[in-house]
């Protein structure tokens, strides 16, 4: 079993861990943190520690392995990325491990490619053990050893490090078998059972809503840290939130509505004095007119992921124009793997990241009553932060309501002969590889639409458990 504590941003979680370790010099500890800056900051307060990261070593993995077998200091400070790599090698009972504000053992990425030859290279030369998951539209796979590959193949294989660096993964089968599917969505994760022999304490804001907790509730028992601070003024009394749209913000809306989004940027650049606020947007947000970037504000830009940043406390205003909403495929993969709902994923992904971003400002000071002003795009984002919200009317065109697009056509129907052949073959309960081979060899010359319908029929049969 692991222990955890759940305390709000700025409550002194890191300080409490450091105080515990300094007061118990005979305790061997490992402090796991997610930024170089935080690791350096913590090392300055720890009485007897060693930091091993890319700033202090050229052979990080090897040095950590050597240290955990023969420690030279009381406390080892390492990154969360390295902890997941070496954790299985740490001996039981030797260390108390503190995972500070690192809240996910899951990774998700997408790869966009429509070239069928490239897809074939991925399927046959990079991935191995591709297996369709019964009753789903997903497959699992591992990755082949690339040590004998040339430079080009090694570079291509690096695109799939998410598979190599985790214990298991799933992806949408359609990317391999449907020409018109251009995006491969991969979700991969660490198996926490590998670390169950260790004494690990996790701490974070709203830990019960983090992905690592939601996916592994059976592993965790709550245990509070000593010395946690309390606010003099409740956080909700210190927030004023403005928003611009009643519709949810999405990447597709940004791509299609750049002129509408530009209205928000123009307004904020008009009302906010330069350098009086910190702000963020998605890395992909860019819209240049005559070489001038329209999606730019005159504040202090920081990334969306702000865990560990303590240098924004002098600002009383911040702007969040990012969108971190999960895709429908990602939601389905999380539901299948961990039983995590779309709402839970949205809360853990976008809304918690937004909350962390807001908590970098003056509101981080617990003994202050100063109000922090926050600007976000959507009402949904605003309501996830506070009830004290107000809409700024900029005449932004809202999203269309869901419904069948004008001019859409009826579903594609297979020719009778092909439909009969497909029924007969599906009755044999083929595996994914058998189905692909049959379709490619026995159904040459079929259209993309036919191929897509056949794959959909195969997946539906898999979900039903095959023929009775």
Predicted ranges, named:
Residues 77, 85, 105, 298-384:
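Conserved RecA-like P-loop NTPase helicase motor core
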Residues 49-84:
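Inter-Walker segment of RecA-like/P-loop motor cores
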Residues 27-35, 200-204, 268, 275-283, ...:
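Conserved RecA-like ASCE P-loop NTPase motor core of nucleic-acid helicases/translocases
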Residues 91-128:
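SF2 helicase catalytic motif II
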Residues 117-275:
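Interdomain helical connector at the RecA1-RecA2 junction of SF1/SF2 helicase-like NTPases
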Residues 2-17:
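Walker A/P-loop
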Residues 16, 20-21, 25-47:
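Conserved Walker A/P-loop ATP-binding site and its immediately adjacent core
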Residues 399-412, 460, 466:
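Arg/Lys-rich, glycine/proline-spaced intrinsically disordered segments
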């Amino acid at each position: 079993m692991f222990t955890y504590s759940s305390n709000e941003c700025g409550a002194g979680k890191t300080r409490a861990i450091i105080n515990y370790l300094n007061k118990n010099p005979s305790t061997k500890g490992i402090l796991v943190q997610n930024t170089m800056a935080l690791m350096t900051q913590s090392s300055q307060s720890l009485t007897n520690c060693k930091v091993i990261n890319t700033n202090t070593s050229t052979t990080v993995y090897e040095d950590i392995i050597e240290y955990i077998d023969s420690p030279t200091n009381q406390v080892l400070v390492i990154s969360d990325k390295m902890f997941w790599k070496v954790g299985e090698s740490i001996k039981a009972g030797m260390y108390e491990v503190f995972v500070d504000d690192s809240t996910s053992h899951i990774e998700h990425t997408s790869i966009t490619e429509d070239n069928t030859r490239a897809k074939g290279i991925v399927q046959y030369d990079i991935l191995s053990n591709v297996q369709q998951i019964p009753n789903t539209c997903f497959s699992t796979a591992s990755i082949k050893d690339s040590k004998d590959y040339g430079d080009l193949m090694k570079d291509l294989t690096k695109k799939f490090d998410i598979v190599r660096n985790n214990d298991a993964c799933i992806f949408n089968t359609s990317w391999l078998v449907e020409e018109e599917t251009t995006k491969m969505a991969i979700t991969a994760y660490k198996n926490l059972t590998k670390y169950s022999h260790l004494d690990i304490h996790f701490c974070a804001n709203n830990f019960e809503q983090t992905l690592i907790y939601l996916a592994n509730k059976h592993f965790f028992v709550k245990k509070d840290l000593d010395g946690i601070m309390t606010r003099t003024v409740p956080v909700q009394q210190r927030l004023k939130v403005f928003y611009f749209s009643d519709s949810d913000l999405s990447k597709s809306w940004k791509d299609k509505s750049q002129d509408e989004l530009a209205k928000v940027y123009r307004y904020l650049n008009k009302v906010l004095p330069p350098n009086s606020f910190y702000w963020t947007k998605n890395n992909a947000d860019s819209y240049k007119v005559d070489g001038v970037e329209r999606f730019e504000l005159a504040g202090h830009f920081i990334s969306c992921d702000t865990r560990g940043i303590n240098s924004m406390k002098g600002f009383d205003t911040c702007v969040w124009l990012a969108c971190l909403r999960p895709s429908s495929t990602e939601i389905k993969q999380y539901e299948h793997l961990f039983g995590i709902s779309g709402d839970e994923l949205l809360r853990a992904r976008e809304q918690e990241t937004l909350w962390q971003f807001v908590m970098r400002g003056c509101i981080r000071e617990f003994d202050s009553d100063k109000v922090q002003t926050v600007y976000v795009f959507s009402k949904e984002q605003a309501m996830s932060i506070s009830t004290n919200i107000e809409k700024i009317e900029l005449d932004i065109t809202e999203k269309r309501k869901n419904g069948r697009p004008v001019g859409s056509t009826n579903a594609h129907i297979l020719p009778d002969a092909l439909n009969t052949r497909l029924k007969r073959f599906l009755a044999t309960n083929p595996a994914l590889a058998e189905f692909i081979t049959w379709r490619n060899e026995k159904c040459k010359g079929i259209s993309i639409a036919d191929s897509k319908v056949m794959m959909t029929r195969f997946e539906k049969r898999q979900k039903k458990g095959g023929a009775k």
